[in-house]
């Protein structure tokens, strides 16, 4: 079996990761940990992406993406360190795009048996404006999704 756990560095994603490790150990399954970097730029409190950016803004966005990639790599490294002591086969992957789309597509394309995700992530403001990743995964994913509180 193959389990996919989506993390964002929050306490909720740590709980999901701990649960996923226990589940993988019990099922003799592999565990892939993912984090999604979304390079899309949104206007404040709007679900619509900004399509027209000045060149200076494009450079700023590129810097923000690089910063997000570094942060994503740190989150994945920390998550891997949290689960490597249990004897589970663990891999990580940094994804790009909207987390709901990126994670659900990755799960389907790579034949995962289930997705495990925390109930609430790091950004309550973003969640209020756009909806939670967990809720989106439950709606969109074609494999079972376990939401950990």
Task: Identify the function of each model-found stretch.
Residues 48-52, 109-111, 133-135:
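Short, hinge-like loop/turn segments at secondary-structure boundaries
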Residues 114-139:
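Glycine-rich, Arg-bearing micro-motifs that act as flexible, cationic patches
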Residues 53-74:
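A short acidic, glycine-rich active-site loop
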Residues 32, 91, 146:
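Conserved beta-strand positions in the Rossmann-like core of class I SAM-dependent methyltransferases
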Residues 35-36, 118-120, 149:
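Short secondary-structure boundary segments
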